[in-house]
Design a protein with these regions (language model features):
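Hydrophobic scaffolds flanking metal-cofactor catalytic centers in soluble metalloenzymes
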Residues: 1-125
């Protein structure tokens, strides 16, 4: 693993612990649970460091699972191209794919995150 990501993963662990404390103190306030994929159905920006963490998580996956993620990501990009939308324009992409199967995060496999330990901060809260 790239050691540059270690401080980020430590921070992500702190976020996880804080979220767990919130869930404990205020049941129902934090809706995230294992198998919940509501946040996987939206578009949001992530930092370059988070993207690197996701990349590292993808590298740890078995080949068949990594290829499945790539196929889903490619399908979303292809759908945007079919509609004439630049995938780098996040707002346009989000509007175009909202309500379609392509809106689901490509890392989501059957309602679970394939890169769970390397997911971005927004996916942890």
């Amino acid at each position: 693993m790239d050691r540059r990501i270690e401080p980020y993963l430590a921070f992500a662990g702190e976020v996880d612990r804080a979220t767990a404390r919130l869930r404990e103190r205020h049941p129902g306030a934090v809706r995230c649970r294992a198998g919940c994929d509501l946040c996987c159905r939206d578009f949001f920006p992530i930092t370059a460091l988070e993207a690197d963490g996701v990349r590292q998580g993808l590298e740890l996956l078995p080949d068949f699972l990594r290829e499945s993620v790539r196929r889903r990501a490619r399908a979303a990009v292809d759908e945007l191209a079919r509609r004439g939308i630049d995938p780098a324009r996040l707002d346009d992409a989000a509007r175009a794919l909202a309500g379609t199967p392509h809106a689901l995060c490509p890392m989501n496999e059957g309602g679970l995150c394939t890169v769970y330990d390397h997911r971005p901060i927004v996916c942890r809260t």
